[in-house]
């Protein structure tokens, strides 16, 4: 049905008010805005002709009644009680809901009692503020309501989002002994900040919660039959004085200060259906409730200094209402309707390499049984020992692909550098020994080549190397003599990853003797290693060429002890070093390719004495 002019009562206020309201007054704007409110089809009922002809004095602000010639005169109920809340009463078991849409039929006798009650209240009131836009409250301790009013309930019966749109609703100014019989009041309060109504007991609201029947005083069993006339409430009241009772403040919704009391009731929901010729506006509201026990945790967090970013520590706010946590991060709609807001961010602990490297090296040394008495070198899996790098493996940074590509592109150069050549050595016995032609030779520490100065190796060549024999042949004979078995020729060079072959030389042992019959005074350990990384004469780390087809090995002797029974007292065993020329590759400069470079490795162990 079509709605009549809702602002009719507001334009014809009677003389008892003594106020002339302009057409553009906020009261009229509120009345025009409330014309677009929705009325539930289940709650809305047509008026009957008998009810339409009822006393106009009773149907004061009836928008469905025919227009009257003059405005209705409001009763000057200046002595009405100031109530703390403006909500609807709970529904009695034998009556229908008492809301703005279901008003109660009041008999003539009840109207007379109401008028008498107003006259008694006028004697107890001291002053009356401006009430042109305020709501009418008429109540009886034993009967229902005589005018179109909302019902007041106690603050404990409010929902989480219920509340009037008035910042300072009416407060009770009477003593407690007078509040008990007047607990059930029918009060109507509407906010001036919005064009919608909040509700309790089934009233309409944009953010609506279901009715809940909670009241300190039980409802009166005598309830008159409901009226089918639907009358909207009067205009909102102006600002009233705020009473310092925290439990008397209603919950707030849009742009109104939060109250000081939070109810302990679960929210309900009421479905709002639009009527004919009306509009619907739905606003999403994020409400975060503080549960019991969380306030103590927040206080502990304040002492420890644990706060979210952007959240201020306000201890002066002792508000009982839950504070809305600031939104952190994007809003995700679950199932397209429910907003999910991430409110917590958990700190993460990132372990840096400074913690992982020592643990990794310790585990590696224990697993491989390595002697890690040295400095760890950054970038390569090596440690520095005996003034040189000791690398058990090549590691991931070894440029094996670049080395093999260079070898494939420069095979002739590699043969000349690495080479196939004939070695013809003459011993002291003279006489042109056997020649071994076209044998690929590997460069080692004691192998003579064209770079050895004249006389550096020929002086003792006849004592250690026979004509036409290689260094590994002599080394193989020494190992066979020490181990008492036979091995294949060249087996000591190998091609394994570590490439280490150890042999101990002890004083008095046969393998420590020379052609002169003298023995080594210091114990030493012979190692044949195939290095992957080494430090050159300039202190730069270079990759040593050791691939499947091109292998380079180093023969070295490492001192086992600092003193021996034959080297003690003022004497001691010292480690000696020697320079080696090896094929190397610069991992930082691919343009250099493979080149020859000098590297220092341990050579032997000698016993030295003080002068």
Swiss-Prot record:
Residues 191-210 have a biased composition (Polar residues). Residues 104-120, 127-153, 169-185 have a biased composition (Low complexity). Pfam families: Spaetzle (PF16077). Residues 521-609 form the Spaetzle domain. GO terms for biological process: central nervous system formation; innate immune response. InterPro entries: Cystine-knot_cytokine, Spaetzle, Spz/Toll_ligand-like. Residues 288-306 have a biased composition (Acidic residues). Disulfide bonds join 522-573, 559-605, 567-607. Residues 57-322, 477-518 are annotated as: Disordered. Residues 1-14 form the signal peptide. Residues 487-498 have a biased composition (Gly residues). 'Spaetzle' means 'noodles' in German. This is Protein spaetzle 3. It comes from Drosophila melanogaster (Fruit fly).
């Amino acid at each position: 049905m079509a709605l009549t002019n809702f602002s009719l009562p507001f334009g014809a206020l009677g003389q008892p008010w003594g106020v002339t309201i302009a057409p553009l007054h906020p009261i009229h704007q509120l009345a025009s805005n409330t014309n677009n409110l929705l009325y539930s089809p289940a709650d809305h009922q047509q008026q009957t002709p008998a009810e339409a002809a009822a006393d106009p004095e009773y149907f004061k602000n009836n928008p469905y009644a025919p227009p009257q010639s003059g405005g209705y005169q409001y009763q000057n109920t200046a002595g009405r009680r100031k109530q703390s809340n403006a909500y609807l009463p709970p529904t009695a078991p034998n009556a229908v809901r008492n809301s703005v849409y279901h008003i109660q039929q009041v008999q003539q006798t009840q109207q007379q009692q109401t008028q008498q009650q107003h006259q008694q209240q006028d004697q107890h009131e001291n002053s009356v503020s401006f009430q042109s836009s305020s709501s009418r409250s008429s109540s009886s301790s034993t009967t229902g309501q005589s005018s179109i009013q909302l019902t007041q309930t106690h603050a404990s019966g409010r929902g989480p989002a219920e509340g009037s749109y008035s910042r300072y609703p009416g407060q009770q100014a009477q003593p407690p002994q007078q509040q008990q019989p007047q607990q059930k009041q029918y009060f109507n309060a509407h906010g001036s900040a919005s064009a919608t109504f909040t509700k309790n007991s089934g009233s309409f609201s944009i953010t609506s919660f279901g009715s809940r029947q909670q009241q300190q005083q039980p409802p009166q069993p005598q309830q008159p039959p409901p009226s089918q006339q639907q009358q909207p409430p009067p205009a909102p009241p102006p600002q009233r004085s705020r009473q310092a009772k925290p439990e008397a403040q209603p919950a707030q919704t849009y742009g109104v200060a939060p109250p000081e009391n939070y109810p302990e009731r679960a929210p309900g929901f009421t479905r709002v259906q639009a009527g004919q010729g009306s509009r619907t506006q739905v606003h999403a509201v994020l409400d975060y409730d503080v549960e019991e026990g969380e306030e103590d945790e927040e206080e502990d967090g304040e002492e420890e200094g644990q706060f979210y970013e952007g959240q201020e520590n306000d201890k002066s706010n002792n508000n009982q209402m839950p504070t809305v946590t600031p939104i952190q991060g994007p809003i995700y709609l679950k199932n397209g309707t429910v907003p999910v807001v991430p409110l917590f961010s958990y700190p993460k602990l990132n372990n840096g390499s400074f913690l992982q490297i020592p643990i990794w090296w310790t585990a590696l040394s224990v697993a491989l049984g390595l002697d890690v008495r040295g400095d760890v070198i950054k970038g390569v899996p090596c440690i520095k020992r005996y003034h040189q790098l000791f690398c058990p493996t090549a590691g991931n940074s070894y440029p094996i692909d670049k080395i093999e590509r260079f070898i494939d592109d420069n095979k002739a150069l590699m043969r000349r550098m690495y080479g196939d050549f004939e070695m013809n050595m003459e011993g002291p016995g003279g006489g042109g020994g056997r020649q071994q032609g076209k044998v690929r030779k590997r460069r080692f520490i004691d192998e003579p080549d064209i770079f050895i100065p004249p006389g550096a190796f020929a002086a003792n060549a006849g004592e250690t190397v026979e004509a036409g024999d290689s260094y590994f042949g002599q080394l193989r004979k020494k190992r066979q003599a020490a181990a008492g078995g036979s091995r294949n020729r060249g087996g000591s060079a190998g091609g394994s990853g570590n490439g280490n072959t150890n042999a101990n030389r002890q004083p008095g042992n046969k393998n420590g003797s020379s052609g002169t019959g003298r023995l080594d005074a210091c114990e030493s350990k012979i190692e044949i290693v195939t290095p992957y990384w080494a430090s050159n004469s300039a202190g730069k780390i270079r990759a040593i060429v050791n691939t499947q087809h091109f292998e380079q090995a180093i023969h070295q002797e490492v001192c086992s002890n600092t003193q021996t029974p034959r080297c003690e007292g003022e004497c001691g065993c010292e480690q000696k070093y020697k320079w080696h020329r090896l094929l190397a590759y610069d991992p930082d400069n691919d343009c250099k390719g493979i080149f020859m470079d000098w590297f220092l490795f341990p050579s032997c162990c000698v016993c030295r004495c003080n002068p």
